[in-house]
Structure formats: C-alpha cells, structure tokens
Amino acid sequence: MRTPKALLLATVALVGVLAAFGETRVEKLADDIWHVRMSRNGEFKGSLIDRYRIWPEQKVVSVGSSLDFGVVRPEARQTEKGFVLRFPLQEGEKVYGLGDSSRETFQRRPGVYDIWMKNVVSYIPVPFAMTSRGWGVVLNTTFRTKFDVGVADRNAMVVSADEGEVDFFVVTGKDYAALLDAYTRVTGRPCMLPCFAYGFMFQANMYADEFELVNQARLFRDYGIPCDGWDLEPGWMEYFYDFTTKKTWNTKRFHYPVYTSSMRKTWIHALERLGKKLCLWLCINYDLLVYEELCAEGKARPSKEKSKNDKAIIVEGFFDEHTEGRFSEKEAIRLDKRTVETRADLALEIPVFRPDNLTGAEQDATEPWFQHLKKFVDQGATAFKMDAGAQVFEWKDRLWAGKYRDAEVHNLYPLVYSKQMYQGFATYTDRRPFVINPDGYAGYQQFSPSWAGDTGGGPKTLVSCHNLAMSGQPHQSCDLDADSSERLHYAFLASWTLQNNWYYHNEPWKLGEDEFASFRDYARLRYSLFPYIYGAAAKAHQRGWPICRPFAFVYPDRPEYADVVTSYMLGDSLLVGVYDEKVLVPEGKWFDWRTGEEVDGPCEKPIVKDARWGGALYVKAGAVVPRWPVKLHIDKGWNEKVELHAYLGADGVSEWYEDDGMSLGYMQGAHSTAKLTLEGSTLTIGARRGEFSGMPAAHDITVVWHKGAKTKAVELGSVPADRDTSVSAPWFWW
C-alpha cells in the first residue's frame, strides 16, 4: 500500500459551503484519528453509542474545521433530517470492511451496501470502510446508512442516511494493520476470550437430556477427541424459546434434587470434571435500553454481587418428585404453578417466529438482562450463546425505553446486548466472559465473538469471516459441518471452532470411519496449536488485527491478492487454503505441513485432498511455532511442557505469549512474552518479559527442527524463564 503525498490545502470554499448547513467541528484525537461533526442548531447531540458509553472515551488534542486529512478530503452536507458524505476514490483504489453487510463481495468496490441488520443476509453490518490509499471512515450513528462504493459515482464512495447528523471518524495509516489499529482505538479493542474458547465447542442435540450429555462428554474423553465447550440449545428451557426473565430448566431432562448438599454432585459438575464448560442458548425480546437510560441518568446502582458457584445452590423453580410427601411445602422447592404444557415437547409444532408470537415484550426491564442469569452462573454455566431471534426483527411501532424509535435502536440493540452480557458476567465472576452473538455493530468486538449464524459452514461464510476480519472483529467462525474433510479443515483452522448439532446426530463417533478419523485428527491439530493461536488472539487484543488474516491484509501492496478469499494466513506464520483446487503461496520459502515439502513462492500449488485431509496448510520458513502436547481440554493459558517447532531456511522472529487464561488481568498487562529468534540454525529463546498470577518459573521445552521432510527433536529439559537460552540444530542431521 502506498500513501500519496499530502493533498494541497483547498478547503476554504468547502468549509464555507458547510457553514450554510450548520457548524462544523473537527477534533484531532491523535496523529491518525479525527472526529468530524456538524450541527444543525449549534449543539452536537452525539449518538446513542455516546450516551451509553459503548466506545472508549477519547481525548481531544486540537479543534479545527478543515476536512483535509492529507490522504482524503471528504465533502459533507446535511439534508433535512439526514446527511450525505462524499469520499473521493482514485483509480484502482481498493475498499474493504463494512462488516457482514454482504457476502457477495470481499473487496467492496464497486458495490452498494445497506448498513442495516437483517436475518441471515446481514447479521453484522459495520459502518466502517478502509482503502488501499491509507484512510478509513467509521460513522458514529445507529441509523440506517448506505455506502455506495463507486456505483453511482465511479470516482467516489458516497455515504448517506435519511436520518441522523454528520458524525464520523477518519483514521489514517500506512496499511490495513495500521488502519485497524486506529479503528479499534476508536471503537474498542477486541476482547480476549477465556482460554478454553480457543479449543472446540460442541453443541448438543436440542432434545438431549442430562444422562445423554454426560455420556457424550465421556465418549469425547474415551475416544481421545479434545473438546471444551458444551452448549445446550433451547430444549434446556422449561418453556421452549423462553424470552422472559422467568426462565428455568426443563426438569424432565435436567434434574436438581433438593436434598443434595453440594452442587458438585449435579450433572453440570460431572460435565466439568470431564473437562466441559457449560454454555446456555438464549433468546431475547427485552427492552435493554431501559437500564441503559438509568445508567446514563445516574440512577442505576451497579451490582456488587459475586458468584456463589462454589456453594450449594438450590434455585427457585426446581422440583424433585422424589421428595413428594417427605418435605414440608416450605422445604420443597416447587415449580411455578403454570398450566401450560412444556413446549419443548412440542417443538416441531411451533410456528415460524413472527413478532406477534414472541413473549417478553412487556417485561419490567429496570434491571439489567444479565441479572436473571446469575443463578445459572452459580450452578456452573460458564458461557452463553445468544440467538439472532428477535434481535433481527424490525419493530416499527415500538418505542424503546419509552422514547426511542426502532429506526435508531435496530442496529444498536445487539451492541447493547453484548455489552450488558459481557459486563454482567465479568463483574459477577471476575472472569473473562464468553458471550457469543451472531449479531453486532461497530464496537461489538469488545464484548463478543461471532459466528456466521444459521448459514452452515460453506464458502460464503468464509467471505463473511474475511469481511469481519477487515472490520475489527478477530473472533469469527461458522457452524462446523462434519460431512467432509474440507469443511473440517476450514472450521478447525478458524479463530474459534464450534459444531452445532441442533436436531442432528453428527457426534464424531456416529460418522463414518474416515470422517471420524478426520474429525479427531483436526481437533488434535487445533489443540496442539493452542499456544500459537492464543498468541495471535493476544495480538488481536493489543492491535486490532485479525487472527485469520486475508491476503489483502498481509500483502497490501500486491494487487493480485486484493480479492483472494480461499487462501489466507492463520496468525503470522501458517498459510491455509480451503474451498479451492489450489492455494496461493506468497513469496519466500514455505513447508507443506503434511509432507514437509519445501516450496519457493510466489507460486500456485494444487491442494491435495482426501477423505481425512481437506485443504492446504503451509508454514513459513523462519517461523518458530509454539505447540503443546495434545490435551483433551484447556484450563489455563500456559502449559508446563512446550514444543518449539523451528522451520529452517530463513531467519525470523516469533513471539511466545502466555497468561493465566481465565482472568481479566490481561487487560492490565498481566501476561508474559518471550522472543523466539531463529538465525541460521540457531534458535534463541529470549528471557521472559512480564508476569501473571500462577506463572511457572520454568518450562520443560523440546525444540523440534524442521528441514524439508526431515525433523529432529531436541529435549532441552527445564528451561528457566528469566534468561536467554540458545540451541542449535544438531550438526549430524545435515
């Protein structure tokens, strides 16, 4: 990417035009960030994003009115109720971003994009675009907007809205990495997920009960298939698709005897002992803005409650038929006296959702949504998966918090939902939240990972993931399809991995022999790569970079890579090819993961697939890839035994990252890093920098040397973390 010389200052006439439509205010926030606003009446209202403090607060360096930012000089005007912005585009200028507004394109020029959340076709529209000339723009509005990228005017990106004020940020940078860094400083850095979230999440069949779940967890262990997350779909609820804050368990399937003296004896903790972390599916139709308004007005009291999940908890709504006649009415905990038959048993008869058959719209919403979920956290739930459900519906006659029309709230809703879930869990547990939302808007990367919704795991979801990667969201995934090695290759080499069984029976041991072997091998591969993927996640938090990186991000100066989707980088050093007959190998020396074949790029290589291997995987020469011995589940962000895989043929510098894996300490810098320097045939393991709670004093390290198809492991034994350690490839190996 080349940043041209600063354009000549020529904005006097433009500012004069703008003045006719109201005051223009340009705040410089940093050398690469500006905030532009126009008012109609002398007031700068701000958006609901500002009111609810969703994006980080910014400090103003200086104030002016010029719209010349060197690499771009936009034009702006306010209409009667909305606005029009025009950003000039040069010949050949590429445009990326705009979230999941369309899965038809990756490079966005030419195209017209509707920034409005829609079910299936546009789960996460993001009003952010960046270009190959080194600038980007993000709108600070939640109203519906349109980005016309070189269609109506082939030499411009025209952004318009029927409602809202001119309020946007301009970011500049030498490449897409710098632009995403600036963008996530404006809208918020991506969170790091708890360590287990970078493993594998299994979503059970919706009609499974506690006995089947525990048995399935045992089978994952017995078959040696790594797995951490364990998600229950809506069948866990007493009332199928319960949108209310009164939800409780379907006690026909999930039992809590009142006479137990410890929650450790329940099925949830049996799952926990098998290494599985419980995730609960949620649906919502709650007026989240009521509580946000209380917070904005200083009337809400922050909760000081802390999780009691180490104690015996009997939650209202659980009834044990075995206690009938033996306990008094006060001693027995009974179900609510409802006459409606449990709808989970009638799931197939439930009609397609429409706004008029959803429940919960009239609930008292003065308390935060997360409040009613605390009882489930106390019982052992460690994650929540939020359904698109009512989030994507349009409520034309609804007033949110009694005063805001849906036109202003529709795009905002999933952002507030993720925020309340994230902050609620973090405050209550002092642990990292894992709150998964398929819907989102600008800034949601602070709170939630996303997946491609109810669209499977095919090639179009890959386009979606790349578009989100170029829109500040490093944690994107899709529903794992277990019916081919190609789809397993894609899903297990994503930023995070989940399988949705819904009504199906796709447990690995129910697949064919080849499919089972492929599933297990890919799961083990992912878990062995945990420290490498985790390091990429840390970099995503620190800089806003993707974990799965499109070629356009990594090689911005190579126009031939501008539209590439099926070849991409996983972190700094792994090249993935999927859903294609060939993989593009960039410049340099690379090693085929399976065969060790050395390949000199740039070139194209055919992807050799079979029933157990579904794509390409290459490693860059000069890389040092930290790996773990395969674990069946992950409980912390470090391990005593570590393998450092050094790929000879080029010099390189890599980084080895660790933290405790579960706490929020990483946000205050509680982590350690060590520089891994490969020069010729010598690897230097740098002294560790930083610290975190529980950090080991030393590691048991094995260096595995790779030279073509040859490998040689050298055990270093216990290596102290406080000094440099160098080791060379064995001379007799050459």
Label every PLM stretch briefly.
Residues 1-2, 20-22, 734:
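Basic/polar N-terminal segments that are highly enriched at the extreme N-terminus
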Residues 46, 50-78, 224, 568-570, ...:
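Acidic, contiguous internal or C-terminal segments within carbohydrate-active enzymes
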Residues 1-9:
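Bacterial N-terminal signal peptides that target proteins for export
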Residues 24-52, 56-58, 68-614:
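Catalytic-domain carbohydrate-binding cleft regions of carbohydrate-active enzymes
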Residues 622-716, 725, 733:
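Accessory, solvent-exposed terminal regions and/or long lumenal/extracellular loops of proteins
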Residues 592-612, 711-734:
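Solvent-exposed beta-strand/loop surfaces of large extracellular or lumenal domains
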Residues 10-17:
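Bacterial N-terminal signal peptides
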